[in-house]
Amino acid sequence: MLDPRARTLLKTLIERYIADGQPVGSRTLSRYSGLELSPATIRNVMSDLEELGLVSSPHTSAGRVPTPRGYRLFVDTMLTVETPIDAEAVARQVQHTLQAGEPQQRVVAAAASVLSNLSQFAGVVLTPRRSHVFKQIEFMRLSDKRILLIIVTPEGDVQNRMLATPRDYSPSQLTEASNYINAHFAGLSFDEVRRRLRDEIDQLRGDMTTLMHAAVTASTEVPDTEDTVLISGERNLLEVADLSSDMARLRKLFDVFDQKTGLLQLLDVSSHAQGVQIFIGGESTLVPIEEMSVVTAPYEVNGQIVGTLGVIGPTRMAYNRVIPIVDITARLLSLTLSQQ
């Protein structure tokens, strides 16, 4: 699409604009590009890039700035993402914050805070989807015909359900029932347990069948918790010159944070892809803000993708720094959650 000269000038322009935040003129391009070109030649190349929609000219300046389309070409074909010099420091900070053994929700919230602190933009995390399978269950007798059902998910979440039964059960009977379910059905969804109980009903005593069906019904009737988006560091964006000078733009951005619907859908889409994803400007109709970019990566528990995290910042962000931050945080969050 572009000849080597035009690619070099576009790359230089974007790098200088990211560094300085000012429209880039031909003198700056001549100084930093390493090309021996006259100002007139550089201006001609800039005109060509503008016709291609890769740069634009602010009315108040003779220089040019990259467009979202220009950023996309830069990220896809010109950006060299290297392990940052402070990668070990980044990893140490993430590991220090994401403590294994902490409740899952606290660990995930800490990841959003880490992303915000390291990037100096907004950190976002789509929390893990609630599991439809169980790792272990336990019955506890509360009183006559009242039983507490304790469900432990593979992610370590503990859920409690109250059961009202037509008859009373002794502690030994409750232990027998929970041992049977854990031995035969652990790792399955409750819908699958229900199907298997129908097949095995002749092998079970009637009182045990009644109790097990009550447990399965109680577990499947409670609706799943909705996916939740955690956001940290929104105020960092007030310090971004590109945004803070435009109240309408800021209001639109904080509407996205407040409603969360588009952000939730964007993070959910990202969870179906491998590795780091980058959404620049208005590319995503889910977060349609021209001046903003979102860098995301999925995270896992025991090899299974359970959520997505990322950074929201201006299109004029240092992608070569933000991408490794998102990638390292996703990997270490996956490791921490898998160790729980």
UniProtKB/Swiss-Prot annotation:
Gene3D superfamilies: 3.30.450.40, Heat-inducible transcription repressor hrca homolog, domain 3, Winged helix-like DNA-binding domain superfamily/Winged helix DNA-binding domain. GO terms for molecular function: DNA binding. InterPro entries: GAF-like_dom_sf (IPR029016), HrcA (IPR002571), HrcA_C (IPR021153), WH-like_DNA-bd_sf (IPR036388), WH_DNA-bd_sf (IPR036390), WHTH_HrcA_DNA-bd (IPR005104), WHTH_transcript_rep_HrcA_IDD (IPR023120). One of its GO terms (biological process) is negative regulation of DNA-templated transcription. The keyword Thylakoid does not apply. It holds the Pfam family HrcA_DNA-bdg. SUPFAM superfamilies: GAF domain-like (SSF55781), Winged helix' DNA-binding domain (SSF46785). Keywords: Repressor, Stress response, Transcription, Transcription regulation. Negative regulator of class I heat shock genes (grpE-dnaK-dnaJ and groELS operons). Prevents heat-shock induction of these operons. Belongs to the HrcA family. This is Heat-inducible transcription repressor HrcA. The gene is hrcA.
